[in-house]
């Protein structure tokens, strides 16, 4: 969060420092993996977004991040896959890719969530977000 905020405040050097701090921790003392981020501009923002995707992979941030960044129509379309990993009797592992679902993100309606009906009923001036019934 902080690295992204610093990027948007025009403090790219601070943003890079914090992304690299996270990468240093993830390296666990190794220097041959996860090189420091040196990019600037849009390339730096892409690195920050990727780092967020990796670091927060199982913490349910991605759904909201891709909407906040307005990139969902690029990354939330097409076939989504999972993987089954099974250990074989000889000790090796077998990796089998399987399709979970096809997705088709519809912008702009899918960028917004519906406003709860009870909130709309409380205020006649409140309008439902596009793509949802009133």
Features from the language model and the residues they span:
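Acidic/polar-rich alpha-helix caps and helix-coil junctions
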Residues: 1-134
